[in-house]
Amino acid sequence: MFRDVLKTLPQYLIPKHGITALAGYFADVKNPRLKNFLIRNFIRKFDVDMSEALIEDPKSYDCFNDFFIRHLKPECRPLSQSDVICPVDGCISEIGKIERGQLLQAKGKYYSVQELLACDGQLAEQFVQGQFATLYLSPKDYHRVHMPIDAELVSMTYIPGALFSVQPATTRVVPKLFARNERLAIFFKTKIGPMVMVMVGATIVGAIGTSWHGDVKRSKKLERFDYSEQFSDKIISQGSEMGYFKLGSTVVLLFANGEKIQWDKELLAGSKIQLGKPMAIIT
C-alpha cells in the first residue's frame, strides 16, 4: 500500500488537465517524423501486436491517435454466443453485485451508483441491487468499445471531473476514483431492463467518443443528451462498436436487474479478458 501511495501522491500535485491537453495535441500531430517516432516507440515499449491490426503498417496511420484507436481484424476477436459478451480488451478490476447502491472500487473502497452517474435518487434506485463489472484498459490494449448485449440507446450524460490515472495502484488509493474522474455515462434499454456503460476518462486521455456522436467535447459543465425521439439508429446490436478512448482508461458496466445476470464463474478481479469472450448468462 505504501508503494501505491508513493505512486499516486504526485497526481495530486501535477496539472493533470494541462498535461492531458498537451498529450492530446501531440497525439493529433500529423508530421510524419514525429507521429512515426511516437508510434514506433509506443509499440516497442508496450509490445503491441500489430499483426492483429486491420492496418499492420505503423507508418500508414495519419497520427498517433489514429494508431491508438486502430481497428482489429474481425477474425482476431470472434464473438461468442454468450448472452452477455465482454465489450473490450482489458482486465477485470472488480465484478459482482451492487450492494445497497454501492460498487466496490478496490479492497475497502466503495462508491455509489448515484455518485458515478451524477443522477437523481430515483434513477439510482433502479440499480440498487444490480450487477456491475469494472474493466481496465491498459495502454497496449485495443481501445474501441463494443456492445455487450443488444440494446436501445436512451440517453448520454457527460460528467466533468478530475483526471487521475486509473491504473490499479491509483484505484487502491484514491477514494471514489471513478465517481471523481471525467466520464461519459450512456444509458440503454435491454431485454432484461436498464443498462449503463460508463466510460471513465483519465490522465492523458485526449478524448472519449461514441459511434453516433464522435469525440465528446471536454467541458466544465455537466451535459445531457436525450435520444428518446430525434435519434434514428437507436438499436445497437451485440458486438457492434459503440465508442472509443483516445488513450486508455476504464469501462464500468451496470445492469439494473441483478437477478437476471449470472457472471461467468471464471471471471475474477485481476483476470485478463478480450472483446467477445463470454461474461454472463441471462437467467
Curated annotation (Swiss-Prot):
GO molecular function, one term: phosphatidylserine decarboxylase activity
Subcellular location field: Cell membrane
Any GO BP: phosphatidylethanolamine biosynthetic process
Record PTM text: Is synthesized initially as an inactive proenzyme. Formation of the active enzyme involves a self-maturation process in which the active site pyruvoyl group is generated from an internal serine residue via an autocatalytic post-translational modification. Two non-identical subunits are generated from the proenzyme in this reaction, and the pyruvate is formed at the N-terminus of the alpha chain, which is derived from the carboxyl end of the proenzyme.
Catalytic site: 89 (charge relay system), 146 (charge relay system), 249 (charge relay system), 249 (schiff-base intermediate with substrate)
Record site feature (Cleavage (non-hydrolytic)), residues: 248-249
Assembly and binders: Heterodimer of a large membrane-associated beta subunit and a small pyruvoyl-containing alpha subunit.
Protein's name in the database: Phosphatidylserine decarboxylase proenzyme
Taxonomic placement: Bacteria, Pseudomonadati, Pseudomonadota, Gammaproteobacteria, Legionellales
